[in-house]
Amino acid sequence: MELPRRALLLSALDLPLAALPLAARAQGGDPAAPIAALNTVLLANMRAGRAVPFASRAAALRPAVERAFDLPAILAASVGPRYAAFAEGAKAALLEAFTAFTVATWTANFDSLNGETFQIAPDTRAAGADVVVTSRIVPRSGEPIRLDFVMRNAAGGWRAVDILLNGTISRVAVQRSDFRSLVAAGDPAPLIASLTERAGKLAAGAKS
């Protein structure tokens, strides 16, 4: 999910299990655990910086991204109703392009450590059947940035299905207008090409 660098920098390093609502704990463990695991790899990449090749950092990050985010659900919500009509092969190609783009975005945005500190709120809140994990990045100077993960408990466990910047701005909603315009003709090929191109630019050093 593509976000500006300062809005992406977050971590879930110190969330005690006892602070979680009983309902969330009863439904399959800690909703923040996938985010904590993601951030372990993110912080390692940030410390390593550009001395480590982009491809190596992306390869290290991809499993954590796939565990932290329900990428098929995010993609389907971003594309909208046309997604269901795509052939299975097209869906698979689109998901691979979206996954590569998502991993490239996080890899590019987390390529250095500049004195930021990362926090996560000790309490979560319910959003229907979902749970919202609230995090902040506190820069060396300036105002903290709030970034909420909307976590859903499905067969694979807790995964994020959206990110809310400042607690309100849905990344899926922002992404939706972009994606849907590219599949307006019912063909996923333009979106696949766009995601592939953008991932390539990120790998080459272009920042989003």
Predicted features, each with a name:
Residues 1-16:
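N-terminal secretory signal peptides and thylakoid transit peptides that target proteins
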Residues 22-26:
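Sec/Tat signal peptide C-region and signal peptidase I cleavage site
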Residues 30-106:
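Early exported N-terminus immediately downstream of N-terminal targeting peptides
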Residues 36, 41-45, 95, 119, ...:
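Soluble periplasmic/extracytoplasmic beta-strand elements of cell-envelope proteins
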Residues 103-145, 195-208:
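Surface-exposed, charged secondary-structure patches
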Residues 144-173:
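Short beta-strand edge/turn micro-motifs at domain boundaries
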Residues 164-208:
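Low-complexity, intrinsically disordered terminal/linker segments enriched in charged
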